[in-house]
């Protein structure tokens, strides 16, 4: 287990690395949080790229660093975009974060979340 000081030191070092490399951080997120997510990425030195379309998601998976996928407010296009992006991330060996908002609500959301198991997100974000 890490001490608070060790955690603080690791966070500071990670932010310094991000600022020096300015990685592209792709996001497929919901309309409620899109500005917050982009601004958070920019604040720590990332280069935010928010996308909706399947080909854009695949491009980000190959060109960018890590990707954030949030299923909070689904749009019909996400039925194609999310699985294609997750597959491309998996095939490229890129890290990605899944925020599985509202698990079990609706057939589309449930179907998408089941598909993600095959592509093994690096981190699954959850609210406590």
What do these predicted ranges mean?
Residues 1-50:
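Glycine-rich phosphate/adenosyl-contacting loop at the front of the ribokinase-like
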